[in-house]
Structure formats: C-alpha cells, structure tokens
Amino acid sequence: MELTRVQTDALVIGGGLAGLSAALELRARGWDVTIVSKGKVGQSGNTIMTRNSMAAVLVEAPTSGTVIEHVQDTLVGGAYLNDRELVRKLAAKAEEGIKSLERWGVPFLRQDGRISSKGSPGHGRERIVTVDARHLRSTHNAGLALSLPLLEKAKEAGVTLLNGILITGLLKQDGTVGGAYGLDRSKPQAWVFESRVVILASGGVGKLYPLTTNAGDVSGDGYALGYLAGAKVRDMEFIQFHPTVSMVASKEVLSTAPLSAGAVLRNKLGDAFMTRYSPEGDMATRDVMARAVYEEIKSGRGSDNGGVYVDYSQVSPAKMAKEYEPIQRRLNGRSTIEVGTAAHFMMGGIVIDEFGRTGVPGLYACGEVTGGVHGANRLAGNALTEAVVFGIEAGRHAGSSRDPGASVPSTLKFTEIEQLLAQDGIYLRHDLPRVAEGNDVQAEPSLDGIKREMRSLMGLNVGIVRSGPGLWHTKEKLGQFQTYLQTYPCRRYSELLALSQLKLMILTALLITEAAWERQESLGAHYRVD
C-alpha cells in the first residue's frame, strides 16, 4: 500500500464552516495550514445542508436585543446544563463572527442597507440573521452560499486542501498530539500527517441514525478520534431531532422560524396539537416539538406517511415572500407541508475551553464536534454561530501559541509509522493479511449488516424516546460489535476502509448510549419513559 507523508504547521480535520474559519485565522498569522476532509472541503458535510440561519445580537439590528438576553435564552433552552463561559463567548463574539464572514465574502439578507433579523422559537428577541442564498438554484444545498466564499478565500490564502481522506487516528507522542493518520477513500493509500497543532472540526453524528437531516459523510468520527487521544466528552446523550423535516424524498429541513410568525403544527385531524405539550405552544423548543410529533404519530394521529403538517395559512403572503421564500416556493400555492422528525444535531461532544483547547496538548476542537455551548437542547441559529465563533477562537489561539515558519520536525521513522498503522489493520508492505484457508468469512456478520443493525438500534432505543431496557440492550450489542470488529478479517482495501469507518461509528454510538444510560432523569432532548 502506498504511503504519503505530509508535514504542516496546523492540520484541520473537517472542511465545513468551523474548519474553514479556523484555517483562515491560522493563515492570517502566517501558519502553513492543511485541511483534510472526508468529502470535498467546502462542498460536503452539514454546512452545505443548513438553512443559513445564525443567531447574533447586532448593533445595526435593534430588535435583536442584548448579549445578556442571548445568553439567557441559550441557557434556558439548554436547561442550564450549558458551560456558561462558552455561552458568554458565543453571544459576545457572534457579531464579530458575522462581520468576519462578510469580510470573507459571505452575503447576508439585508433591508434598507442593514442586515435583516427575525424571530425563532426559543429566542425572546429577533436575532436570527440569514445568509443570502437566492443566487443558488437549489434550496437543498443552500449552505453553499456560506461555504463557497470561505472555500475561495482559503484557496486565495494558500491553505492546502485535501479531499477524500478518512482520518482513522491521531498521532500522540509523550502526551502531545502532533498529527493524524488515515486512508484514502478512492485508492489503496495511507496518509500520515505530522503537525504542530491539530484542530478537530469534523461535525456531528447524523449517520449513526436511520433517519437524519445530515449529509452522508457525517458519521461521528471526531468524537471517537478525540476520545481515543485522551480528550474528555460531555453531554453525549443529548441528540436533537428536528421536528420539521419534509417527508418527500429529499428530506429537506424546513425552518421552524415561521412558527414564530403564525404557522401552526397540525395532526391529520387538523388539530393544532402543540398546546397539549407545552404552554408555549408552537413557540416551544425543538426537543419538545419533536416529542410532540412523536406522540401524535404514536397515538395514531399522524399522516399516512408517518408525519404531521405545518400549516402556513396564518402567515401573511408578504411575510412569506420576504422572509421564507424557499418555503413559499415549496408550498406552490398550498397552505401545508407534511413533515416528520429526523436526527439533526449533537449537543454534546468534546470538552473545550473558550479558546477551543481540549486539555490534550496540541489538540483543539470547534463546531458541532464539541460540547458545552448548547447544554440539553440547542436553539435555532446557534449552531452556525458556534461554528464560526469557536472556529475563529481555536485558529486564533492556536496561531498565537507557537511560532510558525520553521518546518515541522519529522520525528517518526518509517518503521514506527508502519507499526502504528498496523495496530489499525493498515499494512504498508503488503495489501492485507491473508484469511486462513477454510475460514468462511461470508458466514460471519457483514460490515454493512452491522452498520444497518447499529443504526436500527440507535433509532429504536437511543432516539427521541428512551428506556432503561432498550439502552442496556443497545449497550450490550454495540459492545459485541466492537469486540467482533477487532479481529474482522479484511480481504480487500474497500473492506479495510469500511471497517475503519465502522469502528469509529461504533465507538461514538457507544459513548452516546452509555451517557443516555447513565442519565436516568429526563432532561432537554434526553427523554426517558422510565
């Protein structure tokens, strides 16, 4: 198998908003920066799938309120489980993050020359601003209006961009992270990266579940990578399920913002049911909405397709055209859209401080892969704000911590790299270890079969509603999968690639399930029926 070694000042794992923001900050400080992505930098992952909404208090938007109000709403939404220092940083630096994005070429919707702001459930003031994606043909990948300008800026700045690489482990010597290693997704090739700093910005966990709003390459790798390197994780039991996902094939996420402007959730009987579940009615937070939708469907009041409806008839046509034009286009003259729930966002993750430091020397993290900002539930708009704010903070602090310029010392000999990779089943001198004659590997569970069963277990037992017996059963099965995969006999490179990916997925799924098992009370997005 071919081996490629890369030396760089900073290695950023993940090519979405958080990773690109960190990379641009590092380049501004003269650092040699490499972004490695499982998909295409700036053109894959969850950033391109977003609705482009960001929560920020802006001087030019008086109705957005104050930073203190933003902090308070975020704490209330997160059931006060949030890290308050991180929340304060999020709210205080949100405007700077928006201005940085504008400086990097990202357009925002404006009115009378000012950035427009609107309300959303969970927010007491109108602090949701939106990236202008009207120039894009499709609303399904509207986040490209956010990521493509940053991608072009990164290219102009001289950031090295490497696509199609699955990172399978972090390099760690004497307690310090100094790089990473992984596999090429298109050909039999191993990669080893040696760097002064590693920044994890690898996104969420959506593909651990059978139904998700997330992109196809978002499978929770970073949580496992950080954990294996010694980073702590927190709040892993809190998975947000989006309550308004279109039931058509595209599974497009529909903004909940119109619910603050008169839109109403209805069941198949036409009942506006949210008042049965929350005094806030249709202004309730997403965790409450998702459970309400789940209960309506479970009680037989869901649509034939297993969903409910958003009724937009009470939102004025002028407001729909001005603020919710993508939804108006999808309505196409109708007043309702059929929606359901799907795994959407991970509130928990790697523990960081306000500068993105993980506590492991040499390792930073930012964006959805981290925990602490959102607590038990995330408010709309805070995800993208978190990504840019803490991407900038991680890049800024890492870039100020050590002097760039000198080449990264090559400390690993080839034989050491060979031994390190072999621990993960990656063999450089020959393709793969031979399967013993007569060993019928076909009779064993397949990797695809294990992945399907894992997703089914996560959806059934670690989803919107959970129970002790279901969580224990899932813990046991995931542990069995983990043991089995340690000696799985790969026969070809494609199997090695799939196995390496699945090991990371199983570990992250286990971290989620164990956290859900340990928290016996219901809180935020974690709901125990027992």
Region roles according to the model:
Residues 5-8, 187-197, 359:
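Core beta-strand elements of the Rossmann-like FAD/NAD(P) dinucleotide-binding domain
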Residues 10-35:
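N-terminal Rossmann-like FAD-binding beta1-loop-alpha1 element of flavoenzymes
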Residues 197-252, 377, 381-397:
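Glycine-rich loop(s) and the adjacent beta-strand/alpha-helix scaffold that form part
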Residues 225, 231-335, 388, 397-404:
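An anion/pyrophosphate-binding glycine-rich loop and adjacent beta-alpha core
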Residues 28-48:
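Glycine-rich FAD pyrophosphate-binding loop
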Residues 43, 97, 102-189, 201, ...:
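Conserved redox-cofactor binding core of oxidoreductases
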Residues 55-90:
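Glycine-rich active-site loop/strand segments that organize a redox cofactor
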Residues 1, 5-6, 25, 40-42, ...:
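Glycine- and aromatic-enriched mobile tails/lids
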